[in-house]
């Protein structure tokens, strides 16, 4: 339990257990993709990205993308968040490239300052 007003941890279960970031990376990918689309003045409903072979063969949970398929950012965000599609995350990352990594790391660094949880590190979010 976190006191968001004072940004303090009040109670924690298994607080020293190291956990994978898993879907947190997908949430960060979605947030940063939306920020980048806005910054670049891209309409997420009419801007299309092409699915690469690398993206559609990414291991893990999938949005069932197909090599060569063309999808809007909106569709990719749905594929990213609803079935937790690693393939959709890869398409967004490939198309936003280094900007996505830089913005994700910047956001993670900012969050780390706000959420002062011992032994917790969000930064660097992407190496």
Region spans (language model):
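Active-site-adjacent loops and short helices of periplasmic peptidoglycan-processing enzymes
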Residues: 1-127
